[in-house]
Amino acid sequence: MMTQPNLNIVPFVSVDHMMKLVLRVGVETFLKELAGYVEEDFRRWQNFDKTPRVASHSKEGVIELMPTSDGTLYGFKYVNGHPKNTRDGLQTVTAFGVLADVGSGYPMLLTEMTILTALRTAATSAVAAKHLAPKNARTMAIIGNSAQSEFQALAFKAILGVDKLRLYDLDPQATAKCIRNLQGAGFNIVACKSVEEAVEGADIITTVTADKANATILTDNMVGAGVHINAVGGDCPGKTELHGDILRRSDIFVEYPPQTRIEGEIQQLPEDYPVNELWEVITGRIAGRKDARQITLFDSVGFATEDFSALRYVRDKLKDTGLYEQLDLLADPDEPRDLYGMLLRHEKLLQSESTKPAA
């Protein structure tokens, strides 16, 4: 980590610095390397403190805290989800995060995580698909072409080799935006007029819609044998994308069951409905894809360990880049037990500066 001579200083990665870091590394390389960190932390799943995120729900959306620790480092993310924000020119999702040293409790990094969350969500989806999707899958349908769609496409290209996209959104302008942004990225892209058209011939179906509703984006008759479904949009109570019959036909894989049963597609199913945990697939404890006709479903809601992985990755990539600010965030008195004395000394400093003659 960047060593700081003053204990009050915490490295801060702004949105501008994050964009520069991503572009310096390269988007696909960033996604591939980040996926490596995500997978590494799933492999040591049992080392982590795990809890469902702490959520404050309203009719407009949700604000959440997502904490975890591996005993050496502690990380958390603040994130919101407000689907109607785009009507007011605002982002649906915004986020920031902190990485801290467990030994001292001191923060080591403060960073924007709106862009970073989009990257880690896509990287996690691709990690899951690497273990669950049909072998040599090359064609992906993306239903919902808003803020997350390009990241999903590029992650699946970088990690699985997906090079054919079939896009659909209720808003044709969103699809046009996605196509425009992915020009020159090496995709064969088809803009589709319906969900049914988009999923035709797809090896992987990604659903990434934003409305906070129990929607039915995919119905049972749209999903054929052998498909992998990457269900990203359902991520809070009352927000789903898939018809329940699809769930009952699929082998379901989740990040953390206590959270996914509240927020994911499986909130539609009984609490004791059997699901598989992704970490067990990644570590080889259980099988992922077993045969060519199996329907696999990654019920993605996003979990704190993935943000922890992203924070670790950014911390490591920042070395020697200068792509951060030194933020005066922590009180650092000369005598740790004399915090009030620090305030008094600063008062004297301000008084002396105010009495200095003008130059």
Swiss-Prot record:
NCBIfam families: PRK07589.1. L-ornithine binds at R53, K77, R120, D235, V301. One of its GO terms (biological process) is L-proline biosynthetic process. It is an enzyme of class 4 (lyase). Catalyzes the conversion of L-ornithine into L-proline with release of ammonia. Its EC number is 4.3.1.12. It comes from Brucella melitensis biotype 1 (strain ATCC 23456 / CCUG 17765 / NCTC 10094 / 16M). InterPro entries: NAD(P)-bd_dom_sf, ODC_Mu_crystall, ODC_N. Its cofactor is NAD(+). The active site is at D235 (proton donor/acceptor). One of its GO terms (molecular function) is ornithine cyclodeaminase activity. NAD(+) binds at T92, R120, A147, Q148, D169, T209, V232, G233, G234, D235, K239, S300. Gene3D superfamilies: NAD(P)-binding Rossmann-like Domain, ornithine cyclodeaminase, domain 1. It holds the Pfam family OCD_Mu_crystall. It catalyses: L-ornithine = L-proline + NH4(+). This is Ornithine cyclodeaminase. It comes from the Bacteria. Belongs to the ornithine cyclodeaminase/mu-crystallin family. Keywords: Arginine metabolism, Lyase, NAD. Coiled coil: none annotated. Pathway: Amino-acid biosynthesis; L-proline biosynthesis; L-proline from L-ornithine: step 1/1.
